[in-house]
Design a protein with these regions (language model features):
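Extreme N-terminal tail/first-helix region
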Residues: 1-29, 152, 161
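Short, structured beta-strand-loop surface elements
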Residues: 5, 64-131
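Charged, amphipathic alpha-helical segments
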Residues: 12-15, 61-62, 108-110
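Short beta-strand-initiation
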Residues: 25, 40-42, 119-122, 160
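Short beta-strand segments
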Residues: 26-61, 66-68, 74-80, 86-90
Length: 168
């Protein structure tokens, strides 16, 4: 179910846009619950639309693995302030030691944290999205034009598409 907020877009278009934004922005704040408070940290997302999942490489020594094991509902906050594009995703996370998936996700950036994909401390956190909310700007030029038009007409500008997506 989608609340389109007068975007003129279908649920399918909005879902596709949420996936596209997450894939484009790539780095998100991965937010867990430790039983007392939320904990956030930046992680690189690996989007797998076919599997309807978002994967993250993580280290077994981190606290987030324990938090995910106890409280699997997590939030992912993707933010591109320069282009005014944002997507927040909530879903269920699970930790895996799937060595084949780790090798598939391995890239040169991971080398900053581990020597190789064979490092026994690497784990995968897979998040299956349950719902999302996106805010999407048409871009700086269009936003500037909308603000100028608003200044001339006295009407509030519509600068961002906003939509809540349930059961994505």
């Amino acid at each position: 179910m989608a609340r389109e907020e007068n975007t003129g877009k279908s649920k399918e278009e909005l879902e596709a846009r949420a996936w596209e934004l997450a894939e484009d922005i790539r780095i998100c704040m991965f937010i867990t619950w430790d039983g007392e408070r939320q904990r956030s940290r930046p992680l690189a997302a690996h989007i797998d639309r076919k599997a309807h999942a978002i994967d993250f490489l993580t280290d077994v020594d981190g606290h987030k693995d324990e938090q995910v094991a106890k409280f699997p509902t997590v939030s992912l906050a993707f933010s591109d302030g320069k282009k005014n594009r944002y997507v927040a995703i909530t879903g269920k996370a699970e930790i895996s030691n799937d060595r084949a998936r780790i090798k598939k996700l391995w890239n040169p950036w991971a080398k900053a944290w581990w020597d190789s994909a064979n490092d026994p401390k690497i784990r995968v956190i897979r998040v299956t999205p349950e719902d999302a909310e996106l805010w999407d700007s048409p871009g700086r030029v269009a936003s500037t034009v909308a603000m100028l038009a608003a200044a001339l007409t006295g009407k509030s500008p519509k600068l961002l598409d906003n939509a809540k997506l349930e059961a994505i």
